[in-house]
């Protein structure tokens, strides 16, 4: 590696950019895959990409990801780089809220017909795209989850409703997976007790009830962890909770730490209706859905977070800095932890070649998914310039494209994004940081880790080619480290638990030079597993608590230069 580095230095910065095709050690949510353009709103001429409800399984040492209405599925060797597989035999409209289960590395099973009536598909060679159907039909299955236990007994779980609970039944694996025994109701939402299950943005809807959906069963150390999504996929608070049992059919007990997968703050929001899988190093990873909800409510992206089970058997998912760069699953010993690169571009001045109507370039650095820059054309004359206002060490960039009247539907061959990103210290002499001029990849959420970090004050995006008739970008994010000081720890943390014990207000003294804060909380001082990112404020009202649960809170501050130590941890009864 040292010899390669010296060779690249000798060749100059354009050669450094070419090195980005080498393996990356980090990733950044949302996942950068070639999302399918949806067809189930095509009758309204609404065009958008989406990926949701990921079912990720390991099969013979590699990984397969099944995603709602994608007309196929993805394959990966490392959970980082994914290739799309167009199956030869599949559900005609694509699988909906699919399930997948690996049975002893011999057969991979999949379910998820959008009609709710379906055969279980199976394959011993999913790379080939060849599947067969069991000669039986199972009915009335919404968001199915197939699980085969170590003893060979098979179960089907399902549920997607604001009325009906998660249900389950045993199947006869040796008799065409026909139902065996009675349907059993396992559990439903309990909104009067569980604040996070309430509907609406920030759980604010007091009229409509939440939805329970997307069951996914994980077995760990003899315990069964039934994960479920709530309260609504279009909201920032979409999350996964978990119940625990000693048997697949229950009885199930609500885990004290809930929700387990929760990301209501920051750039990308939501972390619900997911699946949990063991990665290349044996660590657990949780995949889930994140909300865009611009063109339609069901416009979504996928995310991946490190997960695990602590010494007390508590399941958790780490979403702290969940849309910042993290170590990739295959990097030994890192367990997907936060890389330590900060956001350099937040609210920095932006200029652009052109802008159409109200969609100006300021949207590119506001950390809001629902705003975007729209150029007057989609040609090579379009550019964006971000002034970081002072030099910083740039380590990675992320370009999040947006669909504005794209007029594309289904799987379309040959889509590609081509662009160049340059860096400069003075605004006059430019070096290529990212070179996608010859790319044949479809990269709607392109994240690139620079092979060699560079010092720059100005970052320039130059468009070459996009697959859509309009050039629209939601966010151009620049990651790295400034040369200043990280903020000090927040002081004067105060907690006010409301009369409605599902709600709490967290306050702290503003920290000079802080860009934002992470509110951390959990059921014990050593179990602060939950995190809520807050920009430009020193107060947070949360409506996600369990009424009879005690909690511990802390707050950390961050800026372009790093992260503070957490504040003192405070207890609220």
Tell me the role of every PLM-derived stretch.
Residues 542-563:
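Beta-strand-rich modules
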Residues 513-532, 536:
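Extracellular low-complexity, O-glycosylation-prone stalks/linkers
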Residues 169, 419-421, 517-519:
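Short beta-strand elements bearing conserved aromatic residues within extracellular beta-rich modules
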Residues 368-432, 444-489, 497, 509:
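Aromatic, loop-rich ligand-recognition surfaces of beta-strand-rich domains
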Residues 167-179, 334-366:
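Predominantly extracellular/luminal regions of secreted and cell-surface proteins
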Residues 380, 441-447, 533-540:
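Short, solvent-exposed loop/turn segments in extracellular or other extracytoplasmic domains
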Residues 479-513, 547, 561-573:
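Pro/Thr/Ser/Gly-rich low-complexity, intrinsically disordered linker/stalk tracts
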Residues 20-207, 219-266, 281, 290-333:
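Beta-rich carbohydrate-recognition and catalytic domains
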